[in-house]
Regions:
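Glycoside hydrolase catalytic-domain context in secreted enzymes
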Residues: 1-58, 65-75, 79, 103-451
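Short beta-strand elements
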Residues: 81-104
């Protein structure tokens, strides 16, 4: 019977007992053959960067490190079954720190999520998983201790002047510089005309744009910006507002199960074309979170338990949608797996970077994603939208993201923990709200910091 096969490329890094935690089998790249007839063969070329085999050292270097030693590069039929392998030898340790950043980064990664580690014993490979019993034991208490309780931000205890700086200078608004948004088509990100364009915006226009970005972005007459529409979701372009029927596609798990990048791009192109025909410019998808358990409430919106597989499929979907002028909100950024709100997620720096952020990272760097939907999760004791290290340091400074960050669905009170003041101060741009209430509006819109 004719069929296609998958070329799965894995690496096994050198491991030092008690050193940087590492998996023995790591997917690094993959490809799909053409349709092959019985007995037919094909030569498939797969490439990847050596730096992609670096591991994150959260304890010592606080950076990605490619440790010296032998790296077994293998073609596998699955994560355990090696078909053939070769060895790559690193002659010395390479620490991607400071000016010696990874080629894919704008700035070198370093520890920024230490507050999310919590008081948890993390499973270690050291001495053949000697701490397994301790790491997997039920916690002695389910209560959140200090200092986390006092630092836990909810709308009920959040001071909306927290991020205001009275030394900030009021920027120019309402200027008549004669520019329109259309004039900036294909302009460089650092083009000085952007500042002149921003000077034309009025406070009311900005406040409305920020507060009411649920399934839309508002028109802004001062710069000739038209209103746009954004639609859900990962398996279909929903017809919430158009009344026009759409097509439902297989869920992301099925798309990822094909291991076919071309198909993922074609899927994104279909979503882009349907969006274009329905008058939508933004797509609330693809979902990029990690399958941690088969019982994850929103697994159907996400690709895989493997970040490399998920990231590559997501990147191709983003590319496909962009072909039709549609921007994709990769979601839910980050460390989110279900419908629960206000749930604190605790994890260490290495796991956050190597597992949970990996799909988003690949979608930004390789797919050129320029829109993000922020999760309902708390990273440690703060909502992800109030985590500047996530939204600014990692997303924008390290990965070079250039685009818009949107909250998840807001409701009329931000579910009790989301508010525009905390969001704007930490890298979120607009609120996914269809109800004009207190929390989705900036509390002090005339303050220089807010403007």
């Amino acid at each position: 019977v004719a069929g296609k096969d998958v070329v799965e490329v894995y690496y096994k890094p050198p491991y030092t007992n008690g050193g940087i935690e590492k998996s023995s089998a790591n997917l690094i790249e993959f490809a799909k053959t053409d349709l092959l007839q019985p007995g037919e063969s094909q030569t498939v070329t797969v490439t990847f960067s050596i730096e992609d085999m670096a591991s994150y050292d959260e304890n010592n270097a606080k950076a990605y490190v490619l440790e010296k030693g032998d790296y077994a590069i293998s073609i596998n039929s699955d994560s355990h079954t090696v078909l053939d392998q070769k060895t790559y030898t690193a002659d010395k340790d390479v620490v991607y720190k400071g000016e010696n950043k990874r080629a894919s980064d704008d700035t070198a990664a370093t520890n920024v999520f230490e507050d999310a580690k919590g008081d948890i014993t993390y499973l270690s490979r050291a001495d053949h998983f000697a701490n397994y019993e301790e790491a997997t034991a039920a916690p002695a208490s389910a209560e959140l201790g200090e200092p986390y309780v006092s630092e836990y931000h909810l709308n009920s205890n959040f001071d909306k002047t927290t991020y205001l700086n009275d030394e900030d200078v009021m920027p120019t608004t309402g200027a008549d510089n004669g520019l329109t948004l259309a004039d900036m088509r294909d302009a460089d990100y650092d083009d000085p005309r952007w500042e002149k364009l921003l000077d034309q915006l009025t406070v009311d226009e900005m406040a409305n744009m920020i507060a009411m970005a649920g399934y839309q972005t508002a028109a802004m007459d001062s710069v000739g910006k038209v209103a746009t529409l954004d639609f859900d979701g990962p398996a279909a372009i929903n017809n919430n507002f158009t009344g026009v029927g759409s097509i439902g596609f297989p869920i992301e798990v099925v798309v990822a199960s094909t291991w076919n990048k071309e198909l993922a791009q074609a899927w994104g192109e279909c979503m882009g074309k349907i969006s274009q025909e329905m008058g939508a410019e933004g797509w609330y998808a693809p979902g990029m979170n990690t399958h941690r358990t088969a019982f994850g409430a929103r697994n159907y919106e996400y690709f895989s338990e493997d970040g490399v597989l998920a990231g590559n499929m997501g990147a191709k979907a983003v590319e496909g949608a962009r072909k039709y002028g549609v921007y994709s909100y990769i979601k839910h950024f980050a460390l989110y797996e279900g419908n629960a709100k206000m749930v604190s997620v605790w994890s260490n720096e290495q796991a956050i970077r190597e597992i949970y952020l990996k799909p988003f990272e690949i979608s930004v760097k390789q797919g050129g994603a320029n829109a993000v939907m922020v999760s309902w999760s708390f990273l440690g004791d703060k909502w992800t939208g109030e985590c500047s290290n996530l939204m600014n340091t990692v997303l924008r400074e390290e990965w070079g993201f250039r685009g818009m960050a949107l909250t998840d669905f807001f409701r009329n009170n931000g579910h009790g923990f989301m508010n525009a003041d905390a969001a704007l101060a930490n890298g979120v741009d607009v609120m996914l709200s269809t109800f004009n209430g207190e929390e989705n509006n900036v509390a002090n819109p005339e303050h220089p910091t807010s403007v």
